Protein backbone atom coordinates (compact mmCIF):
# COMPACT_ATOMS: atom_id res chain seq x y z
CA UNK A 1 0.00 0.00 0.00
CA UNK A 2 1.10 3.55 -0.70
CA UNK A 3 0.27 5.88 2.17
CA UNK A 4 -0.31 9.54 1.53
CA UNK A 5 -1.22 10.17 5.14
CA UNK A 6 0.32 9.04 8.41
CA UNK A 7 -3.09 8.19 9.84
CA UNK A 8 -3.39 5.38 7.29
CA UNK A 9 -0.44 3.53 8.84
CA UNK A 10 -0.91 0.68 11.29
CA UNK A 11 0.40 0.95 14.85
CA UNK A 12 3.26 -1.41 13.93
CA UNK A 13 4.25 0.75 10.93
CA UNK A 14 4.12 3.94 13.02
CA UNK A 15 6.27 2.42 15.75
CA UNK A 16 8.82 1.15 13.21
CA UNK A 17 9.06 4.57 11.56
CA UNK A 18 9.49 6.21 14.96
CA UNK A 19 12.19 3.76 16.06
CA UNK A 20 14.08 4.22 12.78
CA UNK A 21 14.03 8.04 13.18
CA UNK A 22 11.90 8.37 10.05
CA UNK A 23 9.15 10.11 12.03
CA UNK A 24 9.06 12.00 15.31
CA UNK A 25 6.42 11.26 17.94
CA UNK A 26 5.27 14.87 17.63
CA UNK A 27 4.70 14.45 13.87
CA UNK A 28 2.74 11.25 14.45
CA UNK A 29 0.52 12.71 17.17
CA UNK A 30 -0.03 15.93 15.22
CA UNK A 31 -1.10 14.01 12.12
CA UNK A 32 -3.79 12.17 14.10
CA UNK A 33 -5.09 15.38 15.64
CA UNK A 34 -5.28 16.86 12.13
CA UNK A 35 -7.32 13.83 11.08
CA UNK A 36 -9.57 14.20 14.13
CA UNK A 37 -10.09 17.88 13.33
CA UNK A 38 -11.13 16.93 9.81
CA UNK A 39 -13.59 14.11 10.54
CA UNK A 40 -14.65 14.31 14.20
CA UNK A 41 -17.63 16.62 13.54
CA UNK A 42 -19.10 13.89 11.33
CA UNK A 43 -18.30 10.90 13.55
CA UNK A 44 -18.24 12.18 17.16
CA UNK A 45 -16.10 9.26 18.39
CA UNK A 46 -14.59 11.19 21.29
CA UNK A 47 -15.97 12.77 24.44
CA UNK A 48 -12.68 14.52 25.23
CA UNK A 49 -9.24 15.04 23.73
CA UNK A 50 -5.97 15.71 25.54
CA UNK A 51 -4.13 17.46 22.73
CA UNK A 52 -1.79 19.70 24.75
CA UNK A 53 -0.82 16.93 27.16
CA UNK A 54 -0.39 14.37 24.36
CA UNK A 55 1.85 16.69 22.32
CA UNK A 56 3.89 17.44 25.43
CA UNK A 57 4.31 13.68 26.02
CA UNK A 58 5.29 13.24 22.35
CA UNK A 59 8.00 15.91 22.64
CA UNK A 60 9.36 14.23 25.78
CA UNK A 61 9.43 10.93 23.91
CA UNK A 62 11.36 12.54 21.05
CA UNK A 63 13.84 13.85 23.62
CA UNK A 64 14.13 10.37 25.10
CA UNK A 65 14.95 8.93 21.67
CA UNK A 66 17.46 11.72 20.99
CA UNK A 67 19.25 10.91 24.27
CA UNK A 68 19.52 7.24 23.36
CA UNK A 69 17.31 6.12 26.25
CA UNK A 70 15.45 2.79 26.11
CA UNK A 71 12.12 3.15 24.34
CA UNK A 72 8.93 1.29 25.23
CA UNK A 73 7.18 -1.36 23.14
CA UNK A 74 4.44 1.11 22.12
CA UNK A 75 6.74 4.07 21.55
CA UNK A 76 5.14 6.66 19.29
CA UNK A 77 1.76 4.93 19.02
CA UNK A 78 -1.33 7.09 19.65
CA UNK A 79 -4.06 5.23 21.56
CA UNK A 80 -7.60 6.14 22.66
CA UNK A 81 -9.37 4.77 25.74
CA UNK A 82 -13.05 4.26 26.47
CA UNK A 83 -14.75 6.64 28.89
CA UNK A 84 -15.12 3.93 31.57
CA UNK A 85 -11.34 3.37 31.92
CA UNK A 86 -9.86 5.67 34.55
CA UNK A 87 -6.97 8.00 33.89
CA UNK A 88 -5.52 10.23 36.58
CA UNK A 89 -6.47 13.89 36.15
CA UNK A 90 -8.76 13.09 33.21
CA UNK A 91 -12.54 13.38 33.20
CA UNK A 92 -14.00 9.83 33.31
CA UNK A 93 -17.79 9.81 33.10
CA UNK A 94 -18.82 6.38 31.78
CA UNK A 95 -20.94 8.63 29.54
CA UNK A 96 -23.42 9.19 32.37
CA UNK A 97 -24.85 12.40 33.80
CA UNK A 98 -24.26 10.98 37.28
CA UNK A 99 -20.48 11.21 36.67
CA UNK A 100 -20.41 14.19 34.30
CA UNK A 101 -17.80 16.06 36.35
CA UNK A 102 -15.85 13.13 37.80
CA UNK A 103 -12.06 13.35 37.44
CA UNK A 104 -10.04 10.13 37.70
CA UNK A 105 -7.79 10.05 40.78
CA UNK A 106 -5.60 7.18 39.58
CA UNK A 107 -4.62 5.36 36.39
CA UNK A 108 -6.30 2.08 35.50
CA UNK A 109 -3.70 -0.71 35.31
CA UNK A 110 -4.01 -0.85 31.51
CA UNK A 111 -3.41 2.92 31.29
CA UNK A 112 -0.38 2.60 33.57
CA UNK A 113 0.99 -0.20 31.37
CA UNK A 114 0.40 1.81 28.17
CA UNK A 115 2.22 4.83 29.63
CA UNK A 116 5.14 2.69 30.84
CA UNK A 117 5.60 1.45 27.26
CA UNK A 118 5.55 5.01 25.82
CA UNK A 119 2.11 4.92 24.20
CA UNK A 120 0.49 8.34 23.88
CA UNK A 121 -3.15 8.53 24.94
CA UNK A 122 -4.80 11.09 22.71
CA UNK A 123 -8.41 11.00 23.82
CA UNK A 124 -11.38 9.39 25.55
CA UNK A 125 -14.04 7.71 23.40
CA UNK A 126 -17.83 7.77 23.55
CA UNK A 127 -19.83 4.76 24.73
CA UNK A 128 -23.25 3.62 25.85
CA UNK A 129 -23.92 4.82 29.41
CA UNK A 130 -22.12 2.51 31.87
CA UNK A 131 -21.48 0.21 28.86
CA UNK A 132 -25.17 -0.75 28.73
CA UNK A 133 -26.28 -0.80 25.11
CA UNK A 134 -25.33 -1.84 21.61
CA UNK A 135 -25.71 1.44 19.70
CA UNK A 136 -23.77 4.15 21.64
CA UNK A 137 -27.09 6.04 21.59
CA UNK A 138 -27.50 5.80 25.38
CA UNK A 139 -24.47 8.08 25.96
CA UNK A 140 -25.24 11.19 28.02
CA UNK A 141 -22.88 13.22 25.80
CA UNK A 142 -23.90 12.61 22.18
CA UNK A 143 -24.52 9.92 19.55
CA UNK A 144 -21.65 8.53 17.49
CA UNK A 145 -21.99 7.80 13.76
CA UNK A 146 -20.66 4.82 11.85
CA UNK A 147 -17.83 5.96 9.52
CA UNK A 148 -19.18 3.66 6.76
CA UNK A 149 -22.59 5.34 6.79
CA UNK A 150 -23.11 8.41 8.96
CA UNK A 151 -26.81 7.60 9.34
CA UNK A 152 -26.05 4.29 11.06
CA UNK A 153 -24.92 3.27 14.54
CA UNK A 154 -21.31 2.22 15.18
CA UNK A 155 -22.54 -0.50 17.56
CA UNK A 156 -21.92 -0.53 21.27
CA UNK A 157 -21.12 -0.19 23.94
CA UNK A 158 -17.59 0.60 22.66
CA UNK A 159 -19.01 2.45 19.64
CA UNK A 160 -16.71 5.45 19.97
CA UNK A 161 -13.66 3.18 20.22
CA UNK A 162 -14.63 1.24 17.07
CA UNK A 163 -15.58 4.39 15.13
CA UNK A 164 -12.31 6.13 16.08
CA UNK A 165 -10.29 3.27 14.56
CA UNK A 166 -12.54 2.92 11.48
CA UNK A 167 -12.37 6.70 10.86
CA UNK A 168 -8.56 6.43 11.25
CA UNK A 169 -8.53 8.96 14.07
CA UNK A 170 -6.34 6.58 16.06
CA UNK A 171 -4.66 3.22 15.23
CA UNK A 172 -5.61 1.45 18.49
CA UNK A 173 -8.48 1.97 20.94
CA UNK A 174 -9.17 0.23 24.23
CA UNK A 175 -12.75 -0.75 24.99
CA UNK A 176 -14.56 -3.03 27.41
CA UNK A 177 -16.57 -6.15 26.58
CA UNK A 178 -19.27 -7.46 28.93
CA UNK A 179 -21.48 -9.19 26.36
CA UNK A 180 -19.94 -8.26 23.00
CA UNK A 181 -19.22 -4.55 23.51
CA UNK A 182 -15.88 -4.72 21.69
CA UNK A 183 -16.70 -7.35 19.06
CA UNK A 184 -20.10 -6.11 17.84
CA UNK A 185 -18.95 -2.51 17.16
CA UNK A 186 -15.79 -3.92 15.57
CA UNK A 187 -18.03 -5.90 13.20
CA UNK A 188 -20.27 -2.89 12.47
CA UNK A 189 -17.26 -0.61 11.83
CA UNK A 190 -15.02 -3.01 9.88
CA UNK A 191 -12.12 -3.24 12.35
CA UNK A 192 -10.61 -6.00 14.48
CA UNK A 193 -12.00 -6.37 18.01
CA UNK A 194 -10.46 -8.65 20.62
CA UNK A 195 -11.92 -9.79 23.95
CA UNK A 196 -9.31 -11.69 25.97
CA UNK A 197 -10.09 -14.49 28.42
CA UNK A 198 -11.72 -13.29 31.66
CA UNK A 199 -8.73 -12.76 33.96
CA UNK A 200 -6.11 -12.18 31.26
CA UNK A 201 -6.19 -8.36 31.48
CA UNK A 202 -6.58 -6.41 34.73
CA UNK A 203 -9.93 -4.69 35.33
CA UNK A 204 -8.47 -2.38 38.00
CA UNK A 205 -9.64 1.11 37.06
CA UNK A 206 -12.44 -0.12 34.80
CA UNK A 207 -15.80 1.20 36.02
CA UNK A 208 -17.71 -1.95 36.92
CA UNK A 209 -20.85 -3.00 35.05
CA UNK A 210 -20.99 -6.79 35.67
CA UNK A 211 -17.84 -7.86 37.45
CA UNK A 212 -17.94 -11.55 36.47
CA UNK A 213 -18.37 -10.67 32.78
CA UNK A 214 -16.43 -7.41 32.19
CA UNK A 215 -13.12 -7.58 30.32
CA UNK A 216 -10.98 -4.85 28.77
CA UNK A 217 -10.45 -5.45 25.06
CA UNK A 218 -8.65 -3.91 22.11
CA UNK A 219 -9.77 -2.52 18.74
CA UNK A 220 -7.34 -1.99 15.87
CA UNK A 221 -6.97 -2.07 12.10
CA UNK A 222 -5.00 -5.33 12.05
CA UNK A 223 -4.56 -8.51 14.07
CA UNK A 224 -0.86 -7.65 14.33
CA UNK A 225 -1.70 -4.39 16.13
CA UNK A 226 -3.95 -6.34 18.52
CA UNK A 227 -1.04 -8.69 19.31
CA UNK A 228 1.33 -5.77 19.94
CA UNK A 229 -1.12 -4.12 22.35
CA UNK A 230 -1.99 -7.39 24.11
CA UNK A 231 1.72 -7.97 24.82
CA UNK A 232 1.59 -4.83 26.95
CA UNK A 233 -1.81 -4.87 28.66
CA UNK A 234 -2.08 -8.59 29.52
CA UNK A 235 -0.72 -10.14 32.67
CA UNK A 236 -0.66 -10.21 36.43
CA UNK A 237 -1.74 -7.25 38.57
CA UNK A 238 -1.60 -6.91 42.36
CA UNK A 239 -4.71 -4.71 42.29
CA UNK A 240 -7.01 -7.26 40.61
CA UNK A 241 -7.33 -10.64 42.32
CA UNK A 242 -9.19 -12.10 39.32
CA UNK A 243 -6.17 -11.74 37.01
CA UNK A 244 -4.46 -15.02 36.21
CA UNK A 245 -0.83 -15.54 37.15
CA UNK A 246 -0.31 -17.55 33.94
CA UNK A 247 2.65 -16.35 31.94
CA UNK A 248 1.85 -14.04 29.02
CA UNK A 249 3.35 -15.28 25.75
CA UNK A 250 4.67 -12.98 23.03
CA UNK A 251 1.53 -12.81 20.92
CA UNK A 252 3.44 -11.49 17.90
CA UNK A 253 5.16 -14.89 17.64
CA UNK A 254 1.83 -16.33 16.48
CA UNK A 255 1.58 -14.07 13.42
CA UNK A 256 2.37 -15.34 9.91
CA UNK A 257 1.88 -18.97 10.93
CA UNK A 258 0.57 -21.97 9.01
CA UNK A 259 -2.89 -23.09 10.15
CA UNK A 260 -2.86 -26.39 8.27
CA UNK A 261 -4.57 -29.12 10.30
CA UNK A 262 -6.34 -26.73 12.71
CA UNK A 263 -9.83 -27.98 13.50
CA UNK A 264 -12.57 -25.34 13.38
CA UNK A 265 -16.08 -25.92 14.72
CA UNK A 266 -19.23 -24.31 13.30
CA UNK A 267 -22.00 -24.42 15.94
CA UNK A 268 -25.31 -25.26 14.27
CA UNK A 269 -27.19 -23.17 16.86
CA UNK A 270 -25.55 -19.98 15.52
CA UNK A 271 -26.89 -20.38 11.99
CA UNK A 272 -30.50 -19.75 12.84
CA UNK A 273 -33.59 -18.01 11.55
CA UNK A 274 -33.08 -14.27 12.01
CA UNK A 275 -29.50 -14.35 10.75
CA UNK A 276 -29.22 -12.20 7.62
CA UNK A 277 -28.52 -14.73 4.77
CA UNK A 278 -25.85 -12.41 3.34
CA UNK A 279 -24.04 -12.45 6.69
CA UNK A 280 -24.11 -16.26 6.50
CA UNK A 281 -22.50 -15.94 3.04
CA UNK A 282 -19.67 -13.88 4.58
CA UNK A 283 -19.08 -16.64 7.14
CA UNK A 284 -19.25 -19.28 4.36
CA UNK A 285 -16.61 -17.36 2.38
CA UNK A 286 -14.37 -17.32 5.45
CA UNK A 287 -14.89 -21.09 5.84
CA UNK A 288 -13.86 -21.57 2.20
CA UNK A 289 -10.72 -19.43 2.71
CA UNK A 290 -9.80 -21.34 5.89
CA UNK A 291 -10.20 -24.68 4.10
CA UNK A 292 -7.91 -23.40 1.33
CA UNK A 293 -5.35 -22.64 4.07
CA UNK A 294 -5.54 -26.29 5.16
CA UNK A 295 -7.87 -26.01 8.16
CA UNK A 296 -10.49 -28.67 8.81
CA UNK A 297 -14.06 -27.41 9.39
CA UNK A 298 -16.68 -29.51 11.21
CA UNK A 299 -20.20 -28.95 12.52
CA UNK A 300 -20.51 -28.82 16.32
CA UNK A 301 -23.28 -28.21 18.83
CA UNK A 302 -23.51 -25.73 21.72
CA UNK A 303 -26.94 -26.91 22.90
CA UNK A 304 -27.61 -24.27 25.56
CA UNK A 305 -27.06 -21.31 23.19
CA UNK A 306 -30.80 -20.52 23.14
CA UNK A 307 -30.63 -19.77 26.87
CA UNK A 308 -27.65 -17.40 26.59
CA UNK A 309 -29.63 -14.16 26.15
CA UNK A 310 -32.07 -14.73 29.04
CA UNK A 311 -29.22 -15.97 31.26
CA UNK A 312 -27.12 -12.91 30.50
CA UNK A 313 -30.01 -10.49 31.01
CA UNK A 314 -30.60 -11.90 34.49
CA UNK A 315 -26.97 -12.06 35.62
CA UNK A 316 -25.58 -8.83 34.09
CA UNK A 317 -28.35 -6.54 35.45
CA UNK A 318 -28.13 -8.28 38.85
CA UNK A 319 -24.42 -7.48 39.08
CA UNK A 320 -25.02 -3.98 37.67
CA UNK A 321 -27.68 -3.16 40.27
CA UNK A 322 -25.15 -4.01 42.97
CA UNK A 323 -22.21 -2.21 41.33
CA UNK A 324 -24.21 0.95 40.61
CA UNK A 325 -25.55 1.22 44.17
CA UNK A 326 -22.45 3.31 44.97
CA UNK A 327 -23.76 6.22 42.86
CA UNK A 328 -26.00 7.76 45.49
CA UNK A 329 -25.27 11.50 45.44
CA UNK A 330 -23.21 11.35 48.61
CA UNK A 331 -19.80 9.88 47.89
CA UNK A 332 -19.13 11.38 44.47
CA UNK A 333 -20.84 12.30 41.24
CA UNK A 334 -24.05 14.19 40.54
CA UNK A 335 -26.26 15.24 43.45
CA UNK A 336 -29.89 16.36 43.06
CA UNK A 337 -30.61 19.85 44.37
CA UNK A 338 -34.16 19.69 45.69
CA UNK A 339 -34.48 17.01 48.33
CA UNK A 340 -36.10 16.89 51.74
CA UNK A 341 -34.43 13.94 53.43
CA UNK A 342 -31.86 11.21 52.77
CA UNK A 343 -34.27 8.94 50.94
CA UNK A 344 -35.43 11.70 48.61
CA UNK A 345 -31.77 12.58 47.94
CA UNK A 346 -31.10 9.00 46.82
CA UNK A 347 -34.25 8.77 44.72
CA UNK A 348 -33.90 12.16 43.00
CA UNK A 349 -30.15 11.80 42.40
CA UNK A 350 -30.48 8.37 40.80
CA UNK A 351 -33.66 9.27 38.86
CA UNK A 352 -32.03 12.38 37.39
CA UNK A 353 -28.50 11.00 37.08
CA UNK A 354 -29.09 7.70 35.27
CA UNK A 355 -30.47 7.30 31.75
CA UNK A 356 -33.45 5.11 30.81
CA UNK A 357 -31.49 1.96 29.84
CA UNK A 358 -29.37 2.02 33.00
CA UNK A 359 -32.48 2.48 35.15
CA UNK A 360 -34.16 -0.41 33.32
CA UNK A 361 -31.25 -2.73 34.07
CA UNK A 362 -30.99 -1.63 37.70
CA UNK A 363 -34.69 -2.45 38.11
CA UNK A 364 -34.33 -5.84 36.41
CA UNK A 365 -31.29 -6.59 38.57
CA UNK A 366 -32.98 -5.54 41.80
CA UNK A 367 -36.03 -7.64 40.89
CA UNK A 368 -34.11 -10.87 40.17
CA UNK A 369 -32.09 -10.48 43.39
CA UNK A 370 -35.13 -9.83 45.58
CA UNK A 371 -36.09 -12.42 48.19
CA UNK A 372 -39.08 -13.85 46.34
CA UNK A 373 -37.36 -14.21 42.97
CA UNK A 374 -33.70 -14.99 43.77
CA UNK A 375 -34.15 -18.77 43.38
CA UNK A 376 -36.47 -18.50 40.38
CA UNK A 377 -34.20 -16.20 38.37
CA UNK A 378 -30.70 -15.46 39.66
CA UNK A 379 -29.88 -18.91 41.03
CA UNK A 380 -31.34 -20.63 37.96
CA UNK A 381 -29.39 -18.33 35.62
CA UNK A 382 -26.16 -19.20 37.46
CA UNK A 383 -26.89 -22.89 36.87
CA UNK A 384 -27.55 -22.32 33.17
CA UNK A 385 -24.32 -20.30 32.95
CA UNK A 386 -22.49 -23.40 34.22
CA UNK A 387 -24.14 -25.49 31.49
CA UNK A 388 -23.08 -22.96 28.82
CA UNK A 389 -19.53 -23.08 30.18
CA UNK A 390 -19.60 -26.90 30.04
CA UNK A 391 -20.80 -26.77 26.41
CA UNK A 392 -17.71 -24.74 25.52
CA UNK A 393 -15.38 -27.02 27.50
CA UNK A 394 -16.79 -30.11 25.75
CA UNK A 395 -16.59 -28.62 22.26
CA UNK A 396 -13.13 -27.10 22.73
CA UNK A 397 -11.81 -30.55 23.63
CA UNK A 398 -12.86 -31.64 20.13
CA UNK A 399 -11.92 -28.57 18.06
CA UNK A 400 -9.22 -25.88 18.27
CA UNK A 401 -11.49 -22.87 17.68
CA UNK A 402 -15.15 -22.05 17.12
CA UNK A 403 -16.21 -19.88 14.15
CA UNK A 404 -19.48 -17.91 14.21
CA UNK A 405 -21.08 -14.69 12.98
CA UNK A 406 -20.63 -11.67 15.29
CA UNK A 407 -24.08 -10.11 14.90
CA UNK A 408 -27.28 -11.22 13.14
CA UNK A 409 -27.50 -7.96 11.17
CA UNK A 410 -25.38 -5.16 9.74
CA UNK A 411 -25.23 -1.78 11.51
CA UNK A 412 -28.75 -0.43 11.83
CA UNK A 413 -29.90 3.12 11.26
CA UNK A 414 -29.56 5.76 13.98
CA UNK A 415 -33.24 6.52 13.44
CA UNK A 416 -34.32 2.89 14.07
CA UNK A 417 -36.39 2.56 17.22
CA UNK A 418 -35.76 -1.01 18.28
CA UNK A 419 -37.36 -2.26 21.49
CA UNK A 420 -35.07 -3.23 24.40
CA UNK A 421 -35.83 -6.92 23.68
CA UNK A 422 -34.88 -6.54 20.00
CA UNK A 423 -31.60 -4.90 21.03
CA UNK A 424 -30.90 -7.59 23.65
CA UNK A 425 -31.39 -10.29 20.99
CA UNK A 426 -28.70 -8.61 18.86
CA UNK A 427 -26.19 -9.99 21.42
CA UNK A 428 -27.08 -13.62 20.71
CA UNK A 429 -23.72 -14.53 19.12
CA UNK A 430 -21.38 -12.63 21.45
CA UNK A 431 -22.61 -13.06 25.03
CA UNK A 432 -21.77 -16.77 25.34
CA UNK A 433 -18.04 -15.97 25.26
CA UNK A 434 -18.51 -13.72 28.31
CA UNK A 435 -20.71 -16.22 30.14
CA UNK A 436 -18.13 -18.98 29.50
CA UNK A 437 -15.14 -16.66 30.10
CA UNK A 438 -13.42 -17.64 26.84
CA UNK A 439 -11.39 -15.37 24.52
CA UNK A 440 -12.97 -14.17 21.26
CA UNK A 441 -11.98 -12.05 18.29
CA UNK A 442 -14.06 -10.28 15.64
CA UNK A 443 -12.38 -9.93 12.24
CA UNK A 444 -13.77 -8.07 9.19
CA UNK A 445 -15.00 -10.82 6.86
CA UNK A 446 -16.53 -8.81 4.03
CA UNK A 447 -19.24 -6.34 3.05
CA UNK A 448 -23.02 -6.63 2.86
CA UNK A 449 -24.72 -3.67 1.12
CA UNK A 450 -21.41 -1.78 1.43
CA UNK A 451 -21.45 -2.23 5.21
CA UNK A 452 -18.79 -4.28 7.03
CA UNK A 453 -19.54 -7.66 8.57
CA UNK A 454 -17.30 -9.45 11.05
CA UNK A 455 -16.67 -13.13 11.70
CA UNK A 456 -15.92 -14.35 15.22
CA UNK A 457 -13.45 -16.92 16.51
CA UNK A 458 -13.68 -18.24 20.07
CA UNK A 459 -11.05 -20.40 21.76
CA UNK A 460 -10.02 -22.15 24.95
CA UNK A 461 -9.48 -20.02 28.07
CA UNK A 462 -6.00 -18.44 28.08
CA UNK A 463 -5.32 -19.63 24.52
CA UNK A 464 -5.43 -16.17 22.95
CA UNK A 465 -2.49 -17.26 20.80
CA UNK A 466 -4.57 -19.56 18.60
CA UNK A 467 -7.08 -16.77 17.94
CA UNK A 468 -4.25 -14.41 16.95
CA UNK A 469 -2.81 -17.14 14.71
CA UNK A 470 -6.03 -18.04 12.88
CA UNK A 471 -7.40 -14.47 12.61
CA UNK A 472 -4.05 -13.25 11.24
CA UNK A 473 -3.97 -16.09 8.68
CA UNK A 474 -7.53 -15.33 7.53
CA UNK A 475 -6.88 -11.57 7.44
CA UNK A 476 -3.87 -12.11 5.16
CA UNK A 477 -5.83 -14.55 2.97
CA UNK A 478 -8.95 -12.43 2.38
CA UNK A 479 -7.29 -9.00 2.73
CA UNK A 480 -8.18 -6.00 4.86
CA UNK A 481 -11.15 -3.77 4.15
CA UNK A 482 -10.37 -0.32 2.74
CA UNK A 483 -11.56 1.98 5.50
CA UNK A 484 -13.76 4.97 4.54
CA UNK A 485 -11.90 8.15 3.51
CA UNK A 486 -14.57 10.53 4.88
CA UNK A 487 -13.33 13.31 2.59
UniProtKB/Swiss-Prot annotation:
A Gene Ontology molecular function term of the record: ATP binding
Which reaction does this enzyme catalyse, per its entry?
Answer: L-glutamyl-tRNA(Gln) + L-glutamine + ATP + H2O = L-glutaminyl-tRNA(Gln) + L-glutamate + ADP + phosphate + H(+)
**Residues in the active site?**
82, 157, 181
Bridged cysteine pairs (disulfide)? none
- What is the enzyme's class at the highest EC level? ligase
Q: What keyword terms does UniProt attach to this protein?
A: ATP-binding, Ligase, Nucleotide-binding, Protein biosynthesis
Asked if the record carries the keyword Oxidoreductase, the reply is: no
EC number(s) recorded for this UniProt protein: 6.3.5.7
Q: How is this protein organized at the quaternary level?
A: Heterotrimer of A, B and C subunits.
PANTHER family, sorted? GLUTAMYL-TRNA(GLN) AMIDOTRANSFERASE SUBUNIT A (PTHR11895:SF151), TRANSAMIDASE (PTHR11895)
Function, please?
A: Allows the formation of correctly charged Gln-tRNA(Gln) through the transamidation of misacylated Glu-tRNA(Gln) in organisms which lack glutaminyl-tRNA synthetase. The reaction takes place in the presence of glutamine and ATP through an activated gamma-phospho-Glu-tRNA(Gln).
This one is known as Glutamyl-tRNA(Gln) amidotransferase subunit A
Origin organism is Fusobacterium nucleatum subsp. nucleatum (strain ATCC 25586 / DSM 15643 / BCRC 10681 / CIP 101130 / JCM 8532 / KCTC 2640 / LMG 13131 / VPI 4355)
Species lineage, top-down?
Answer: Bacteria, Fusobacteriati, Fusobacteriota, Fusobacteriia, Fusobacteriales
